């Protein structure tokens, strides 16, 4: 593998044995691609905004004399960029402008004569835009739209598993689900009649819908039944014989062949042998006794040829009398329905008999009554209702997916078709459900991923937009019919409010529009790749059963079987597997390598769950020889959802990677294959809660996916194009682009601005730091700056800690964690949290609130940190209770006399009395002010601080743009100087030229002169561009802010809080091994090894065996080896000053070559001495290793690593007790584990209360930290005190410490006076009980004597 300059800084040793055929696809593509399809103009009009417009327009007036047509749309430019939207608290969106055409037709002239056409561009609201990282900024906060897994439209056949009827009989049903429109269900009842339901309403006999579709009884019978033909003879009947139909029947008569030989005697059962004999003798007719026909059903109406009277009606039971009537009328032939109990049931025949209707009109009326009970049906209304249910494109749409699923399920060859149902579709569904009831077909599995599809952002936004358009459509149609259209323009017809309201509602408050989880890069990526079965049109937690939540065989490579929440949402919220993607229909696909004749090719194909069932697929870890041929005879594979063994020649596909089945979060867990799935689930979930530490540290033991994740998440800055680093400071990186990557006529400079100390959604700190230096070459995709939780472009969620598995004085009982004081001293787990506190000044009825430093009844010291405008200065250290923004509110005064009121109205004098309503630091918070923002309403005078901030921003913008201009100008000038050099100017001449004269020189060569003129033009453009950009920036900064009604001013103060690690904080490894810190131990008391190095953390060994997460032990061993190798390299670097680099080079080469069949090849010999030295220096802290899931380091390789590091291969060391110096009685497992600090900090949870707020009804203290509440003393605690006999304690708990109002106020006074006595009274809850009993009509009074 070829490494770029920056990749050579630190190479992760990879233990992977399988070749990487396919890189992990871009992780956010599910979000970005979906939204791109929504906003991009689609000429076919099948998706996105275009489809929504085309489905609603043209809108015709009721009279048909005018219509509004859609022409095209365009999205404008957003007013503010993403960062500005976040600061100002507005939505990042672009205006949607639609070109509409209004056509007026001439009433008098022939139909279709156009009288007038008006075209106009109409504003139709703002559409929120997606940022480059797949999020939306809605009202200043970043949100993610989670994709939804819902049941695909189409037709599904199912049964009730025998749960409906007491007999346990299985009742089959069919359901046609459209993308939008009414659901149509068919179902059997226990008596085997077929019923239909529309939209889950009352059921009707299924033949009603057939009658409504204009089928007669005769046609219905012909559709669903075969016939049996009889010829009527004098005393007998002759039946046309189909031998197969006799199978399994008991003969009620002798069955003879054509010669009269008896084949089956009466009373015997007809077997397959008898049928073969009948077929052999070519018997086509069979004489049967007259009684044989009794109980059969006529296949058609039989009419007396003379009188026209119906002798036997279709579907009626035939008796001997009917037969006699037919004989008398001279009818010689008779057809009956072929019915048998086994596989040709009489279902439709039975249904027809309970069907109350006889013709189409009656059927339509019956359907109308069921859909609109209580309304009088008319013929037209009934017709229109039925037509609109399933056959109108406006009301019903199966969608492309639905039609494809429908046709495939019913074996209709074409995948395309109409979006509405046809007569044939409904008949085909009925035939299929009867087919299933007869035992010829299987029901569907609704949890199969072929029957569930993904609805992503774009599709949901399109649906929501269509909802808004439909609301507008009604209004437009009315306006087209009412007004004088000659005067009106399209703009006057359209009101954009309903559209923007629908879109806003979706992005702002839909269940699937979620506040982005921004703890760390992994949590961001996982949130964007989340697939939820909940939400509108999906399941609900309560109704979701066990089957829906369970792992299904089709999840393989599509949804992760490990990563899902614990708790009520388990299995309903899933994560996309690493390589999965959605196809054009919205079904999940996963890639496979093609296998031809037992040889694995590198050709990759994506298969959906439905396609996968047809093939035989082997796993990625099968043995292959050097030519890619499978070695073993029998190969473990999957076929039709089952695991089985097959010959190599039968294998058709193979997995692309062992990590294919798991999500990115699960594939970050090293040695995942050695962990129990429950613990792996916790490990995957807890990595998302890791807080970014002050200094990120890459994991020593990783899985090789860390870099991909960090780059794809968008928190690091990656180079867009190759070049050389030209300039680096803390907030900007400038890259001079390579000549071959330049676009014609550009300056060739890329500027990357870094994000500094901003707040994330979870109040953690987002900060980017450059990790490159001037002069370094970069290629596209190289990491230039690290973000939160990344280290040299690798994801780094925690810290590598030296760990020992041993008990230590009970401090690691029940998963507690003992840590060394050194960890806190070195700030290993120190995190920075940024809080945003807002102070809003409103206009009240009594006058305006004012932000000022002049606050009543507040001492000088409390105001010491405020400036003259009453706002805290940046850099101030504040603690709980300090004033951040001084604010006074007018206070309601005593009743004014009419004269005073008049004076107040005339002179507009403010209320004289004000109260302090300043913004203070919350209790238990202390930190440093890092930023202040002031937003002032348009038309309100800005205070001094706001003007200062504005000036600072303008100066900063000028400086930034100026530097950018300078850099770009220098780029143009350097190209011009090179041009002059090539044209014969000497270097001294060029150096002597002033900057402005470089571009105005005259060159003899015409081509070069033209080029120089182009550069001069470019320079002018740059200048103009700079002025324009600065003007826009200045206008944005100085314009007033659009604040909510009644708000005059908002001051936002940002407070940085530094949190060191302390007892009560939650920590975890990556294997689901979580615990709480119990004690921070002095370094000298910690166990230490023979070299005197103490361990950092002591974990309980009992936490491993029962939890079955052995991965952590292997990680500790491999971590020890990696660290040991780092120490050896450090020692060699000390020596290399005398010996040179040869020893280091050999050792590093040895390390990278270690392991059997390892795919990674690092050509250390090709490294220059400088590169090697830089690599070695970066490896001093330990060589990072990658052990991919299901393809990781084996025990033998870990032992080889330990040997290379000069450590015992058992992975255990002798340890000594830090307090006594005595050796522990047996060796202890010591090594390095990657530990995370989770966002469950004791500072956020710890809370205490003495007095505070009380509940209104019960007068008991509230609960929870947010309400400043207390702990509930519940009934179990009462029982405990009763059991102890602690009567007085109990009395005080239930009275003065809870809801005895008088008692507690008295007690407070007593304590203040130093009198420690109490008099308990009546608890309020007793009064509540009395009132509740009185509400039942029983009067209870307390007799106080």
UniProtKB/Swiss-Prot annotation:
GO molecular function: DNA binding; DNA-directed RNA polymerase activity; ribonucleoside binding
SUPFAM superfamilies tied to this protein: beta and beta-prime subunits of DNA dependent RNA-polymerase
Keyword field: DNA-directed RNA polymerase, Nucleotidyltransferase, Transcription, Transferase
Disulfide bonds: none
Lineage top rank: taxon: Bacteria
Catalytic activity: RNA(n) + a ribonucleoside 5'-triphosphate = RNA(n+1) + diphosphate
NCBIfam families, sorted: PRK00405.1, rpoB
Subunit organization: The RNAP catalytic core consists of 2 alpha, 1 beta, 1 beta' and 1 omega subunit. When a sigma factor is associated with the core the holoenzyme is formed, which can initiate transcription.
Protein name: DNA-directed RNA polymerase subunit beta
Gene: rpoB
